[in-house]
Amino acid sequence: MSFFNPPANSNHGYNDDVNTGYNARMHSKLAEREGFHLGNGSDEPRTLYVGNLDSTVTEDFIATLFNQIGSVTKTKVIFDGSNDPYAFVEFSDHGQASQALQTMNKRLLLDREMKVNWAVEPGQQQSKIDTTRHFHVFVGDLSSEVDNQKLREAFQPFGDVSDAKVIRDTNTTKSKGYGFVSYPKREEAERAIEQMNGQWLGRRTIRTNWATRKPGDQEKPSHYNEKSYDEIYNQTSGDNTSVYVGNIASLTEDEIRQGFASFGRITEVRIFKMQGYAFVKFDNKDAAAKAIVQMNNQDVGGQLVRCSWGKTGDTGKTPGGSYGYGYGNSSSGGNSQPYSGYGGGGAYGGGQGGGGHGGPGQQQSNANSQYWQYYAQYYNNPQLMQQWSNYWQQQGGAPQQQNSGGHQ
């Protein structure tokens, strides 16, 4: 007879259809009545339900077994006569309880498969843990077969993984080849980054790095960060979710996503290498505003980036047109502002007001005029000036500056 065997496959206990005998509502009430810590609100649970036990088990036996995983503070075995005995096991913290859940669920104990789950109210066990102040690790070059579970398992040896997510295309659900792993402790994330970089996961070697600046790091001085969230939020229309990111130099899409992923779901990243900027589009305005407030003049992949609102140019919409990004003058005739518009043929999107550029089927001469105007508008930016100077040297010289009227 086998005393204690590992499980045939991994299972984390959540929504476990084979976890017969477990009743979340009933067992959570019983655990609460016995004085176990279940957690509520921001207080994370640390008590487990352990079911399908042999009738010979004792509280000392269960406590000794689970103490191999973490510090057990309380144990109670329930014998109700009509069903197999079950137990509640409380740990000193959520991380140890989570590790025990993943390690012990479906293990054979006295030839019986243990059923381990959180002893919490229905729905509470699936509530998302707030990882805002946790430490986030970017994982790149993931092979297509790696899912959330495999990602979590690969990084579990380095600490209590609070979240693991493979980023997928919203239309095809296929993996985009990267993901994020979160830890509540800095040293756990640092250890994972150091030891997992270049390791094999699935069919490929992976890259690891910080997903964004680490919580608790000193903020770099920034006059922009002196503005409040409300000020930034109210600077643009209610449906704007586009963030302009300047000074990106040679940053890749992965690196930009790393830097901004912690603020919310990113729906699109468009990069304009020659101009030295990108647009990051979020699925809601709140996430975009937070990104601007916190990331302006912050380090992303070794670059100190500048962040402000992108501006959606609806006047550039054309049937069947694709996204185009560029700079246009505001309708008020004020300073130029970066915007993300809809343009034809993947060229530069139409701007607002008299200084707009865009439209399908533009000729090369018009395109050259556009380049010149972008250069002229941002003549006071030394980095952009150097980029354009290099470009025109390659083109054999800059064209004569056009009048300020728009090009249609």
Curated annotation (Swiss-Prot):
Chief localisation class: cytoplasm
Domain RRM positions: 46-121, 135-213, 241-312
CDD domains xrefs: RRM1_TIA1_like, RRM2_TIA1_like, RRM3_TIA1_like
Subcellular location: Cytoplasm; Nucleus; Cytoplasm, Stress granule
Record has Thylakoid as a keyword: no
GO cellular component: cytoplasm; cytoplasmic stress granule; nucleus; P granule
UniProt cross-references to SUPFAM superfamilies, sorted A to Z: RNA-binding domain, RBD
Keywords: Cytoplasm, Nucleus, Repeat, RNA-binding, Stress response
Reported tissue expression: Expressed in the germline and also in somatic tissues. Expressed in Ggonads and oocytes. Expression is slightly reduced in the most proximal oocytes, especially the -1 oocyte. Aggregates mostly in the head neurons, muscles, intestine, vulval and hypodermal cells during heat shock. Expressed only in the intestine as a response to heat shock, starvation and dietary restriction.
Disruption phenotype: Reduced lifespan, impaired stress response, delayed development, reduced brood size and an early behavioral decline with uncoordinated locomotion at 6 days of adulthood. Have smaller brood size and 10% embryonic lethality at 20 degrees Celsius. Produces 2 to 35-fold excess males at 20 and 25 degrees Celsius, probably due to increased X-chromosome non-disjunction during oogenesis. Shows impaired heat-shock response: only a 3-fold increase in phsp-16.2 expression (thermotolerance biomarker) when heat-shocked compared to a 10-fold increase in wild-type animals.
One Pfam family, short name: RRM_1
Molecular function in Gene Ontology: mRNA binding
UniProt superkingdom: Eukaryota
GO biological process: determination of adult lifespan; nematode larval development; nuclear-transcribed mRNA catabolic process, nonsense-mediated decay; regulation of locomotion; regulation of mRNA stability; reproductive process; response to oxidative stress; response to UV
Record's function text: Acts downstream of ced-9 in the induction of germline apoptosis under different stress conditions including starvation, osmotic, oxidative, heat shock and UV stress. Plays a role in the formation of stress granules in response to heat shock and oxidative stress but not in response to osmotic stress. Required for the formation of stress granules in the core gonad but may not play a critical role in this process in the oocytes. Plays an important role in the formation of stress granules in the embryo. Protects female germ cells and embryos from heat shock.
Protein name per Swiss-Prot or TrEMBL: Cytotoxic granule-associated RNA binding protein tiar-1
Species this protein is from: Caenorhabditis elegans
